[in-house]
Amino acid sequence: MKIQTFIFNWRGQYQNTLNKEKQFKEIGIVPTVINSDESYPFEGDNWHCIGEESYFNAQFLKAIELFDGDILFHVQGDASYDNWKDLITDAKTYYEMANWGIYAPNVDYTWYDSSRTDVNTIDFPLDKLKMVANTDCTCWFIHKDVINWYKERKLDFSKYKMGWSWDIVLPALCYINQRPVLRDYNHTISHPRGTAYDTNKAEQEMWHLYNSLPSDLKEAFGLIKSNKEGLSRYYE
């Protein structure tokens, strides 16, 4: 099973990204860095500089373009953790056990905390793993099947900048196809509070994308946003 690791770097996160790159290399992984900080345009063949104007959406589209593995593992530049090896091992182990579509660790600061995302109407038998509506996109593993479903739908994210909807649309595809969306509370990623971008614009883009979706994705999208327990209908 090939896990392809991506780190997204942007202005102000250079040292954090280098630290993670070093951690990954110490366990035999050379991550691909999708970089939008033109102050550091090239740090090695594994760095892809896509321009200062690029935000999360362009970075994620670039990661999908470069992805040729079984699992896409994405980590934000401002996230930190001290045990990537065990997290990756658990991702593999639980894939073999549960055939998940998306697997992610807990994050210490995210809008999608347990109260907003745990789907309590779907029982999951493994300790500290929960079915969730949205894992958050700070650090997550996405199986290639989910990427392929996105491509087959011919969804057009290219017109957007912020990329808020990736962590809604991809879980929606998982629920429609009955592939678990899991958060592992055995691992917690450190993530700082606050954002450095226009959240109003991000929300406007999200709803613009929503209005362009086919009806089945709209339904799952709406449940993820406002009625997480309703997602259990996909498992009835």
Task: Please identify what each model-predicted range represents.
Residues 2-7, 31-33:
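Hydrophobic targeting segments
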Residues 9-26:
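Short, well-formed alpha-helical segments that are part of the catalytic scaffolds
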Residues 13, 157-236:
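C-terminal catalytic/acceptor-binding lobe
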Residues 21-49:
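Acidic donor-binding segment of Leloir-type glycosyltransferases
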Residues 51-59, 163-164:
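A short, glycine-/small-residue-rich helix N-cap motif at loop->alpha-helix starts
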Residues 61-71:
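Active-site nucleotide-sugar/metal-binding loop of Leloir-type enzymes
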Residues 70-80:
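Short beta-strand-to-loop acidic/aromatic patch adjacent to the donor-nucleotide binding site
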Residues 82-158:
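Conserved catalytic core of nucleotide-sugar-dependent glycosyltransferases
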